[in-house]
Amino acid sequence: MFNYGNANEAQKEAISATDGLVLITAGPGTGKTFTLVKRAVYLIQECGIKPEQIMMATFTEKAAKELITRITNELAERNISVNVNEMYIGTFHSLCLRIIKENLEFTRLKRNYRLLDTFDQKYLVFRNFHKFKNIEGIDELLSKGGSWKRSDEICTYINHLSEEMVDIEALQSDDNPGIRTLGRVLSVYQEMLEEGNLIDFSTIQTECYKLLMQNKQILEELQDKLQYLMIDEYQDTNYIQEQIVFLLGAKHHNICVVGDDDQGLYRFRGATVSYTHLRAHETLA
């Protein structure tokens, strides 16, 4: 019999509810990490799932490292010898980057690509600001100020559009002049990334999504492999992250999401796939 430790009844239910779509509403300080750790161990010990068949997405690297450490320790205490590093644990960005690296030859990126951090991205736009300042309607889009400030505003627009997976052609053909300007800004920026063999944090997810959508074999291999997905802080996921989750989980449908805001979970409730609606208000809410 599985040793749940000091888990209460609601946590035990969350740990052992492994099949289908599972929603756990949980507030801060209510044992979310404890429950996710036990759930991963339960899958390995009781269900015979291999570490590489589990994906766990967090919103900070610190949270991901904590999960890895605690799962490793928990398995060691149970004398279960597996390589936890084979699990897909990390932020959405790190998980998407891992998928890209594993299939780099199927992306637009070459082997010596460079990943831009926030400053690098802003500096790239600043250094190439002349490519943006002649775009029709750019002055109406940006506030008055120097090129550095306006470069920062451009990056904000670009990142938001990338995260929401907005179609460039749709933007550029929109009836609204301001929307068309945004489309041109995004187009110029993406050309810069391609020319420089560059990728930034927001386009990591876009490139990963494109990779999966344009390469059926890669998608099917990942869908076969990743049998269980767990997403922490689900209410904070953006559109493209959600699309990637449901794309990867489309075969097995074993997706567990944890969130502390009922309103923020409405998208999951509206999923077309049947799911288990698990509430644990006494201990996980």
What are these regions (language model features)?
Residues 72, 76, 130-133, 194, ...:
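A general structural signal for alpha-helical elements within enzymatic catalytic domains
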Residues 277, 284-285:
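Single conserved hydrophobic/aromatic residue that forms the stacking wall/gate
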Residues 17-18, 83-86, 105-198, 202, ...:
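ATP-hydrolysis module of ASCE/P-loop NTPase motor domains
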Residues 4-16, 20-23, 55, 63-64, ...:
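Conserved helicase NTPase motor core
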